[in-house]
Amino acid sequence: MSVTIRLTIRTAVWRSHVARIANAVDEAGGGLVPVVKGNGYGFGRNWLAAVAADFCDTVAVGTMHELDGLPDQLTAVVLTPTLSPPEAPASGSSGPVLTVGSQAHIDALANWGGRVIVKLVSPMRRFGGDHEMVQLAKRAGLHVVGVSIHPPIAGS
């Protein structure tokens, strides 16, 4: 026996909700970075990225493979570290922002010259390295634009 579930989205209401959140984040001095990875939560990653492009200039994707089909005006942050630099960006594009979380990631991207976020380790010890990785990445010719961290779970 199979069960079919049908989900209907009131698109105008949903987009209005997303716009309110994006505006609230902007007013608070932040910048919204939607995560559009995997299958796009059933909507399709490229469709969600196109919607996100109406509200922001940066999206996060899970892997390098998820860069295909993103709107040209979006900057993509790749959350999963890679051991190979991407191909040269299209004309007028600055290319994706990659994540590095270990010396091996830095070594693999050395002299690539692109932008990176350094993933720092948290008390959870889930991923990342210590704060010295920021300087290691810079010395390897990478342009460090920020750091990321997995916050600890409450009570840890």
What is the predicted role of each segment?
Residues 1-2:
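Gly-rich Lys/Arg/Thr-decorated short loops/hinges at beta-loop-alpha junctions or inter-strand turns
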Residues 5-9, 13, 30-156:
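Active-site-proximal beta-alpha core segment in soluble small-molecule metabolic enzymes
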Residues 7-25:
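N-terminal basic/disordered segments at the start of proteins
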